[in-house]
Structures are given as C-alpha cells and as structure tokens.
Amino acid sequence: MNPLAQPIIYSTIFAGTFITVLSSHWFFTWVGLEMNMLAFIPVLTKKMSPRSTEAAIKYFLTQATASMILLMAILSNNMLSGQWTMTNTTNQYSSLMIMTAMAMKLGMAPFHFWVPEVTQGTPLMSGLLLLTWQKLAPISIMYQMSSSLNVNLLLTLSILSIMAGSWGGLNQTQLRKILAYSSITHMGWMMAVLPYNPNMTILNLTIYIILTTTTFLLLNLNSSTTTLLLSRTWNKLTWLTPLIPSTLLSLGGLPPLTGFLPKWVIIEEFTKNNSLIIPTTMAIITLLNLYFYLRLIYSTSITLLPMSNNVKMKWQFEHTKPTPFLPTLITLTTLLLPISPFMLMIL
C-alpha cells in the first residue's frame, strides 16, 4: 500500500464509523457504512497475495449484499411509514430485513462463514481491525433499534452464533481463525442481551475490544499465526509466556479475570427477566471456547517442539517494537473484575 494513501484510507474508515454511530437518519447511516466498507478493502489487501485478494473479494461481496438488504429495508420503511429516523422503524418486515443485514455485517450465524476466511487471509493487525473496529457501526445501529427488534429472532441468531463459534474453533490450528470463531461467539452474547438491557451490550463490546486487542498485540509481537509457532514463545520472547495464557483465559471468560464480567452480568440480566434455560444453554456451549483456549495455553507454556535446534534457549533475545499501551491493556484484561460494581453503577 502506498504510504501516502494510508492516512486517507484510515481517516475514511474512522469517519464512516463515526457518521454511522452519531447519525439518527437512515440515509447518513447507510452512507457511513458504505464509506467504511469501501475504505477497509485496501486494508485487507495491504500485503498483496492471492489469499488477501480472495479475502477482500469475500468481504466485499458479503458487505455489499448486506448493504443492499439494508437499503431495501430503509426504502420500504420510508414508503410505509414516511419516517427516515432510526428510532421510528415500526414496520415489522423492515425491522426483520435490517436485523438480517446487520447479522451479515457482524458475522453472526448463519451468515458467519466469511469471518474466519477473511480473517485468515489478512495480516494480524488488519484482522484486529476487522474483528473490533468494524463491529462498532453495525452494533450502534442495533443499539438504536433495540426497542423495535424481534426478540425471538435475535435470540435464535445469538444462540446459533454461540454454537457456531464454539464448535467451529475446536479443530483449528490457525490462530486467526480461532480468534474469528471467538468473535462470532462474543457477538452472540452481545446480541442476546440487547433487547433486555442495551447498556450491557455496550459493556460487553468494550471488554471484548480490550481483550481482543490485547490478544492480537501479543501474537503480533511474537509473530505467531499457528499453534506450532505459539509453542516457540518461551525461547523467543520469554516474558510473553505468562501473559498469553492469562489473556486467553480472560478471553474465555474464566473468573476472576475481566472476561468473566460480561458473562456474569448477561446471565444476571436474563435471570431478572425470569429466563433460565437460555443463559444456561449459552454458558454450557461457551465452555467449548474455554477448551480450545486451554489447548492454546498448553501449546504456549507446556509443549516443547520436537526439533532440538528450535528449542534451544537463545543467548540474545530479539528486539521488539515498543508497544506503550500493552501494559495498560494487559492490566485491564486481567484485573478489571474488582472494579465491576463501579462500572455497573455508571451504566
């Protein structure tokens, strides 16, 4: 990618997201989504290869289809109700089409097949943007429409996403695909609580972004993209050996780490609404996520490579790029649970 084009591309991505998040008019919301989508395609092909080109095409086709469905829903809602504001989407069919379009953009099941493939075909940092920043605009639309969503359809999509994300990551050895399936599971948890308490969705999204950003930065420091490369952490960057397992356990939602907080408050919210079967099912299925995180932890801190030349301790470690925000992110990833009452009081 041309260095001169990078500021323009990233500025367009951020501007498109902010236009969508801050707008209450359907036309400007759609324009922001299109700006964001078209500017993100060069980021996916930052390192030109057949795999990245394929990933960009898959991303474009999926997002363009979702945008077409969204535009059709916006126009039909305007024809039937005469309203352009997002909070006045009263037509049931328009609401269903908008939910379908947003599920495609978020990568929720059964529209999730593009997420692992696109994430696998991009560099780690582009994958980080795909799984974090690109979720903000669709979730903001769902947040503003939370009062007019079809609860049964949303819960069905959420449970399907949790199942697809948990089962899909079981036999994977590619770290980017594992994190993509983890993202699908987290999207299911966020959308499940949206009709009951939208603020809990925002809390879940914030913690998810912190955990995912920390994980990607640690893997990028180690240049790890597979479980085999992850097992070389101890003799390449020794100080990462305790940090990667703790981050992965938090991403899996194990108490007393930060990742347990969103699952705790979501289950509590369902309990307040006299719903026990749905959160129990979600929690049991999510245990599969914890299983494949434990596999990664085993590869990082316990497994030794069979090649003797690769397992010798290096006498001089590699210099890594400075990451000033990483200590703060690691602290937030592991130690945020004790201040959760204060966070819940703000919400």
From Swiss-Prot:
Catalytic activity, reaction form: a ubiquinone + NADH + 5 H(+)(in) = a ubiquinol + NAD(+) + 4 H(+)(out)
GO biological process entries: mitochondrial electron transport, NADH to ubiquinone; mitochondrial respiratory chain complex I assembly; reactive oxygen species metabolic process
CC annotations in GO: mitochondrial inner membrane; respiratory chain complex I
Principal EC category: translocase
Compartments (UniProt record): Mitochondrion inner membrane
GO molecular function: NADH dehydrogenase (ubiquinone) activity
Taxonomic superkingdom: Eukaryota
Membrane-spanning parts: 13-33, 55-75, 96-116, 123-143, 149-169, 178-198, 201-221, 247-267, 274-294, 326-346
Name of protein: NADH-ubiquinone oxidoreductase chain 2
Gene that this sequence comes from: MT-ND2
